[in-house]
């Protein structure tokens, strides 16, 4: 199971003089300097608030800073936040003089193109980059006019992981100046009940903290508030410097009347498991230590100091050994030995005598350690009910013996065979951390970077403490067959004391009366099974404290866990498997608005008749991929490229969006139910799309008011001999003579060379042909007892770059550039919808201003799209007449 990463947040606000455009040197924005008073260069930060809501370990954090420019000229203001590496940004908004500019999460490839254009123009400023051990720095800068106000609001979410028996939230506070309204508010809601809650600050004495801090908890609720006055913020009674510079730490734990707790909201569930009071399972541990020349000096002394402290904590029931590697491999003992006082004393002397020397032979050292653990198990020289772990520490890359990372990974994977975990500790930055992480992950362990600081020995000790006390091995979390969908990881090699296993998923039947779960594992004495049964009505009562619950928190927790685990699996996947994992993680990231390694957040703000576009990326631990946007993202001043898109949805409304005009044209087609219309036909690529019309459940006598929709779509590729029939119930795929049928209740991805089909349960289907063509089919479901309307389909073309110039059809003809002019706007028969004259394709038409719905992102409500409506079935806009597009069947 994944071990804890402490959540961190650092707040800092910088201000500087405005410059023409934006500075070319990112350090102008990222450099820190002391700000002496409440206002600097005319910029006053008058409010900074951090609002954290924690519901069942899932934290929703909003950081809001407000500033005003008192100067007579425009100034540049920068907003700095450091957030946990384990967190996902979910939103950023910029509000200037009451106008709010929201952020949008997009696929990273889109941001990459914007970044490349920005670099070519030389207009860049830092936005997001990795910062320190557990942090990522978010920085955004904006020009603020004289007398204007600006508000920055950043939202991020993460799952708080249990670490040594507590959930911990670290807020690193650093406002850089006195702030009139400074406040941190944390509200915690835990259905199990809160057992402990504490808060402390490293930058203020307990006497001063007491009057600025309030903390309380009772039953399920906990509350912490830190609200220092201006005088309490001063570094001395007459100073204008702020003493708010350091850690604000909140820790808590929950009641554990039973080992497990299950919570269910809106068809999603989360299962927490953390038993207490179990005897510790004896362990066999092999320490594989790099003693190459690069470990010379301080690193070697810190490593030896940590190992000596670890030896003091090894339990007498444990077995251990040390393997040292440089250019060759040496061992303390030929085999594992029990941790008797005599052996511990001898091991301590061995550690003190370690000397650095030579090269780095990782492969042979790991294989020696694995062989030692396997042999001890096979020869029964260790207790039957014990577990094995291997811990490697290295500060560099393999450079002797087998040095190819992929071959070392293969050798280690085959040798371990899934029997025990490998933990890799990377000392410093001069190593291939991705290699260490990937090798650990595929062997049920994890990697941790050890930073070259004065506390490196404490970092090593702290890691060992996390794995020192296994309480269970071979943990399996089980649910009734066919009751659960989309389950996160439910199998773990170990459960360690002070940690917690978290599993989430979706109920197949939301109307069930009860829910059962079982956790099985091997204990120190016998095999254990922990069962939990939930009464759904009782669960509903227990979760009625809606004031503390933000939205569908369990669904978002499930999405967070799923994305995190998909990204971990993706690191070692190859070929088609990697493509599927990437597509699944990307789809969830976009759906739930998470900034992950596959997505970026883009904020666009009009300024000086240009668009200012901020792009926020998710950095990683490893070295930069040359093909990706750097982990430092950018704020650019240029017109972001826009892509036209086309769709038909509703009654059936055809909408053509034209970015060059910042406008749209729409028209209806009024035809009888059963009619099939040609939407797209490309004779070059062989792609066709046809749609069949359905009517209402009860016909209307007035044909002018009847409503029709698309009830069936046919998508075909002649070149690939591939067809898709989409109805309101099923999706059928033909690949030559092979047939596959899925329902709208499925979530599944089908891929082959040049094609991917992603079905998202009860929502939409995304079809991509290579990189140049993407269609989206949206499923609209109505209340089953609705007297008039059926379920129906919407069809969207979101990428048509791969279509040829010969493409035609009711939608396809508009893939080619065309122009239109609108003039003589005047009141129409409906006072809310003006009429106008449109000149298009050598026709002069009377059009009406109206709006249609875009349901791609919000199926239930949709987004209004303003458009000019062309009457009479699009006559004059479409080539020919609408009946020219009627075809006999779907294919």
UniProtKB/Swiss-Prot annotation:
Modified residue annotations for Aspartate 1-(chondroitin 4-sulfate)-ester: 651
Domain of life: Eukaryota
Matching Pfam families: ITI_HC_C (PF06668), VIT (PF08487), VWA (PF00092)
Protein keywords: Glycoprotein, Protease inhibitor, Proteoglycan, Secreted, Serine protease inhibitor, Signal
Propeptide intervals in chain numbering: 21-34, 652-891
CDD domains tied to this protein: vWA_interalpha_trypsin_inhibitor
Glycosylation sites: 91
Entry keyword Cytoplasm: no
GO CC term (a single one): extracellular region
Signal peptide, first to last residue: 1-20
Domain VWFA: 284-467
InterPro entries, per database record: ITI_HC_C, ITIH, VIT, VWF_A, vWFA_dom_sf
Keyword Signal: yes
Gene Ontology MF: a single term: serine-type endopeptidase inhibitor activity
Subcellular location: Secreted
Record-level GO BP terms: hyaluronan metabolic process
Main location: secreted
Domain VIT: 29-158
Role noted for this protein: May act as a carrier of hyaluronan in serum or as a binding protein between hyaluronan and other matrix protein, including those on cell surfaces in tissues to regulate the localization, synthesis and degradation of hyaluronan which are essential to cells undergoing biological processes.
Family (UniProt): Belongs to the ITIH family.
Subunit annotation: I-alpha-I plasma protease inhibitors are assembled from one or two heavy chains (H1, H2 or H3) and one light chain, bikunin. Inter-alpha-inhibitor (I-alpha-I) is composed of H1, H2 and bikunin, inter-alpha-like inhibitor (I-alpha-LI) of H2 and bikunin, and pre-alpha-inhibitor (P-alpha-I) of H3 and bikunin.
Protein name: Inter-alpha-trypsin inhibitor heavy chain H3
Originating species: Bos taurus (Bovine)
Gene for this chain: ITIH3
């Amino acid at each position: 199971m994944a071990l804890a990463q402490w959540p961190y947040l650092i707040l800092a606000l910088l201000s500087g003089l405005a410059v023409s455009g934006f500075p070319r040197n990112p350090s102008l924005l990222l450099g820190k300097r002391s700000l002496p008073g409440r206002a600097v260069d005319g910029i006053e930060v008058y409010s900074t608030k951090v609002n954290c809501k924690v519901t069942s370990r899932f934290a929703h954090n909003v950081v809001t800073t407000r500033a005003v420019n008192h100067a007579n000229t425009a100034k540049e203001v920068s907003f700095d936040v450091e957030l946990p590496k384990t967190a996902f940004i979910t939103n950023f908004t910029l509000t200037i003089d009451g106008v709010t500019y929201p952020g949008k999460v997009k696929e990273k490839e889109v941001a990459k193109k914007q970044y490349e254009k920005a670099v070519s123009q030389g207009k860049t400023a830092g936005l997001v980059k990795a910062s320190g051990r557990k942090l990522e720095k978010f920085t955004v800068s904006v020009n603020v006019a004289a007398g204007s106000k600006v508000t920055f609001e950043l939202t991020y979410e993460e799952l708080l992981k249990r670490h040594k028996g507590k959930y911990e939230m670290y807020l690193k506070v650093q406002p850089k100046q006195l702030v009139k309204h400074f406040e941190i508010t944390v509200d915690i809601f835990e259905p199990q009940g809160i057992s402990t809650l504490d808060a402390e600050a490293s930058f203020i004495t307990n006497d001063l903290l007491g009057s600025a801090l309030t903390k309380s908890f009772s039953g399920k609720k906990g509350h912490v508030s830190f609200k220092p006055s201006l005088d309490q913020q001063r570094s001395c009674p007459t100073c204008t410097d702020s003493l708010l510079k350091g850690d604000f730490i909140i820790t808590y734990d929950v009641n554990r009347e039973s080992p497990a707790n299950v919570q269910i909201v809106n068809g999603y569930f989360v299962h927490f498991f953390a038993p207490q009071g179990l005897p510790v399972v004896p362990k066999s541990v092999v320490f594989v230590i790099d003693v190459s020349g690069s470990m010379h000096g301080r690193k070697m002394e810190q490593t030896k100091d940590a190992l000596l402290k670890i030896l003091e904590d090894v339990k007498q029931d444990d077995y251990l050994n040390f393997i040292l590697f440089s250019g060759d491999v040496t061992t303390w003992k030929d085999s594992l030995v029990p941790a008797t006082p005599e052996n511990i004393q001898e091991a301590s002397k061995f550690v003190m005598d370690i000397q650095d020397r030579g090269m780095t032979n990782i492969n042979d050292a790991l294989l020696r350690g694995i062989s030692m653990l396997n042999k001890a198990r096979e020869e029964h020289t260790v207790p039957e009910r014990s577990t094995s772990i291997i811990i490697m520490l290295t500060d560099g890359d393999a450079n002797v013996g087998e040095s190819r990372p992929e071959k070392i990974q293969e050798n280690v994977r085959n040798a371990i065979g899934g029997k025990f975990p490998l933990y890799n500790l990377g000392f410093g930055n001069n190593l291939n951390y991705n290699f260490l992480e990937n090798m650990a992950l595929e062997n049920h362990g994890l990697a941790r970077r050890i930073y070259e600081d004065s506390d490196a020995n404490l970092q090593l000790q702290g890691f060992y403490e996390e794995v020192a006390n296994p309480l269970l091995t071979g943990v399996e979390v089980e649910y009734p067959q066919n009751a659960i969908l989309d389950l996160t990881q439910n199998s773990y090699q170990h459960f360690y004391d002070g940690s917690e296993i978290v599993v989430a998923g979706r109920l197949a039947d939301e109307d069930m009366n009860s829910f059962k779960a079982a956790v099985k594992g091997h204990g120190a004495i016998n095999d254990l099974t922990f069962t939990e049964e939930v009464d759904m009505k009782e669960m509903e009562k227990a979760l009625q404290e809606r004031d503390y619950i933000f939205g569908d928190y369990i669904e978002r927790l499930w999405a967070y866990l799923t994305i995190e685990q998909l990204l971990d699996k993706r690191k070692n996947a190859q070929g088609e498997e990697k493509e599927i994992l990437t597509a699944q993680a990307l789809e969830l990231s976009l759906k739930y608005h998470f900034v992950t390694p596959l997505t970026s957040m883009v904020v666009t703000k009009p300024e000086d008749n240009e668009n200012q576009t901020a792009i926020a990326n998710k950095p990683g631990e490893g070295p930069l991929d040359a093909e990706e946007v750097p982990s430092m993202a950018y704020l650019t001043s240029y017109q972001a490229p826009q892509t036209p898109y086309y769709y038909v949805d509703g009654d059936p409304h055809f909408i053509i969006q034209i970015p060059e005009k910042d406008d749209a044209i729409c028209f209806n087609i009024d035809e009888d139910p059963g009619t099939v219309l040609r939407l797209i036909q490309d004779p070059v690529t062989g792609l066709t799309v046809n749609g069949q019309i359905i009517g209402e459940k009860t016909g209307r006598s007035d044909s002018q008011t009847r409503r029709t929709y698309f009830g069936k779509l046919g998508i075909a590729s002649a070149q690939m001999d591939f067809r898709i029939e989409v109805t309101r119930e099923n999706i059928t795929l033909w690949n030559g003579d092979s047939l596959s049928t899925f329902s709208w209740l499925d979530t599944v991805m089908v891929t082959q060379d040049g094609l991917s089909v992603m079905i998202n349960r009860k929502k939409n289907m995304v079809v991509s042909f290579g990189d140049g063509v993407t269609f989206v089919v949206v499923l609209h479901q109505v209340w089953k007892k609705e007297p008039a309307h059926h379920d129906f389909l919407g069809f969207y073309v979101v990428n048509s770059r791969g279509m040829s110039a010969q493409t035609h059809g009711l939608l396809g003809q508009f893939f080619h550039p065309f122009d239109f002019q609108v003039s003589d706007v005047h009141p129409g028969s409906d006072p809310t919808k003006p009429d106008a004259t449109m000149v298009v394709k050598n026709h002069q038409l009377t059009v009406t201003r109206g709006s249609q719905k875009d349901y791609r992102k919000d199926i239930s409500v949709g987004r209004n799209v303003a458009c000019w409506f062309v009457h009479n079935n699009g006559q004059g806009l479409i080539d020919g007449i609408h009946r020219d597009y009627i075809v006999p069947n779907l294919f």
